């Protein structure tokens, strides 16, 4: 007697994307409390100009860097953050930002919301 196929659906396990966070760019404005403060772990380039051999080169690992800041956007393969801002007088908003960083999203290992 032939085996019957099970009618159970196989559910695909969703893998949580660790490289991006959902962000509503239109609602951010200049209210600092609306910007998520994040820690981003990302892979950097490693180089050495000295003499070596291929075995040593094959053992090298990429350094993992950590950047923390206010997440501005993640679009077109680029993640943008800033760490400093100038407060607006008498309001919880900001006029200008400083210490900006842009990171290729493809090198991000993880991004975590800190607050």
Predicted feature locations:
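Conserved RNA-binding domains used in RNP assembly and mRNA/RNA metabolism
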Residues: 2-115
